[in-house]
Amino acid sequence: MLYSMNLQKLTGRHTSFWLLLAMVCGTLPAAGNVPAEVDPDYEDSVVMIMAVHQEYDYTTPWKKGSMGRGLGSGFVIEGGRILTNAHNVANQRYIEVKKQNFARRYPARVEFVGHDCDLAVLSVADPSFFMGTKAVEFGGIPTINSTVQTCGFPMGGRQISITEGVVSRLETSVYSHSQAARHLV
């Protein structure tokens, strides 16, 4: 199931926020020349995920695959957890999370992962990480022609990116991460 968030409280405008688009940070056309902003109450709730991963070599399992690292986006949700994409933490060896404009990184661990829907839930043992954050609220699926906003750290960017656009189509498709099921995208 795809979740979205109503950002009426975040921006003071009636907009819907499509969480999956935000985490993947697909590009949407800019809505005018006004820069998009997120309510300061939620600014620290969008976090950077840094993962060290190691691919498995299924043909020679006694050999370790090469190590790599990646960056992604996540969002603080209720229960002191972070929602992110499964592909951000797949084959992970070590995960850290960081809030925007903060230097400190916090170790995180995978609590749940759903590769078929490309979603994962992370936990952070240190409760100080969640100070100043507010759990993002889930809303319904946006309607055609509604304004949506994406925010996150796309393509390994180290600065948060916020983009607004309009929903032009809703459809189901084979999901890109697992190719195993059809989901609303």
Describe each PLM feature range:
Residues 55, 78-160, 183:
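Conserved active-site neighborhood of the chymotrypsin/trypsin-like protease fold
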Residues 1-12:
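N-terminal secretory signal peptides that target proteins for export/translocation
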Residues 45-51, 56, 60-63, 125-135, ...:
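Active-site region of chymotrypsin-like
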Residues 72-74, 108, 165:
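Glycine-centered structural positions embedded in regular secondary structure
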